[in-house]
């Protein structure tokens, strides 16, 4: 049993080290970081893959580390509301289209065609900057 505990402790320490290194790298590289305020509990319960694996990846811990490291450096960490339809808005023209989760390519009437996640990331950044300006 001690051997198993030692292995789990080693894995936890490696994960913690990895999260610290990546959050430090991002905090040093960027002045503003905008993220979607995801409800990880709901995602884990809905069973996108393995629920335990969703909690086990340390996403919440990573965001906490990133937030305090950015603030220590006088930089900005902005959370965009979980109900903001980032993947449904065309970042080029602003039109809104509903898609199924299985649809990975965003196609808009304005002619924009691109990866749905990339489009959502641009929208999260744009909304985060808007939120930051309103403070």
Give the ranges of each region predicted by the language model.
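Positively charged, helix-rich recognition surfaces that bind polyanionic ligands
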Residues: 1-135
């Amino acid at each position: 049993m001690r051997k198993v505990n030692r292995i789990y402790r080693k894995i936890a320490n490696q994960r913690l080290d990895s999260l610290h290194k990546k959050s430090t790298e991002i905090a040093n590289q960027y002045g503003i970081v905008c993220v979607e305020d995801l409800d990880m509990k709901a995602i884990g319960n809905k069973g996108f893959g393995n629920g335990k694996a969703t909690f086990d990846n340390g996403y919440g811990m990573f965001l906490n580390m990133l937030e305090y490291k950015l603030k220590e450096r006088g930089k900005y960490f902005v959370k965009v509301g979980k109900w903001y339809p980032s993947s449904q808005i065309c970042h080029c023209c602003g039109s809104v289209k509903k898609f199924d989760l299985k649809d990975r390519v965003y196609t808009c009437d304005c002619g924009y065609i691109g990866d749905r996640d990339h489009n959502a990331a641009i929208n999260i950044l744009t909304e985060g900057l808007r939120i930051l300006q309103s403070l």
